[in-house]
């Protein structure tokens, strides 16, 4: 079960008001605000020519990441990486922990990690919240 704080709820309300997209989850860090939107609402969240995202970035004065939701863990992981081609996803279960090893090409590794590691850190936290699984990046 995902617990949302008052700040999370304020951010979700502002995002939904501006974009019209339905937000399933929100994660706020000092550098980034990340939203998970309902499957099929990603285009609405971004807006024509990125207009909604631009307004939201200005409102929060930090980087904004938007991901599409999925009930399938593998598809959710692919959604976390967006336009970055994921070559392979292997999920290993040991005892009570799950770890997803995500393979990307060496050329895409920097984009997958993100500036200051923000994309991979957010991805790990969101995957842990949604599926109780850790995320490891592997490059080939």
What are these regions (language model features)?
Residues 1-140:
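RNA-contacting regions in translation and RNA-metabolism proteins
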């Amino acid at each position: 079960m995902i617990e949302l704080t008052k700040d999370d709820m304020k951010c979700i309300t502002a995002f939904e008001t501006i974009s019209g997209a339905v937000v399933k989850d929100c994660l706020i860090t000092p550098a980034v605000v990340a939203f998970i939107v309902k499957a099929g609402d990603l285009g609405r969240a971004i807006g024509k020519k990125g207009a909604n995202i631009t307004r939201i970035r200005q409102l929060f004065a930090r980087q904004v990441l938007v991901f599409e939701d999925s009930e399938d863990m593998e598809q959710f992981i692919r959604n976390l990486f967006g336009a970055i081609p994921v070559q392979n996803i292997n999920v290993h279960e040991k005892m009570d922990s799950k770890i997803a090893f995500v393979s990307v090409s060496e050329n895409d590794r920097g984009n997958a990690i993100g500036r200051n590691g923000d994309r991979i850190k957010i991805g790990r936290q969101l995957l842990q919240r949604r599926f109780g699984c850790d995320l490891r990046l592997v490059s080939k």
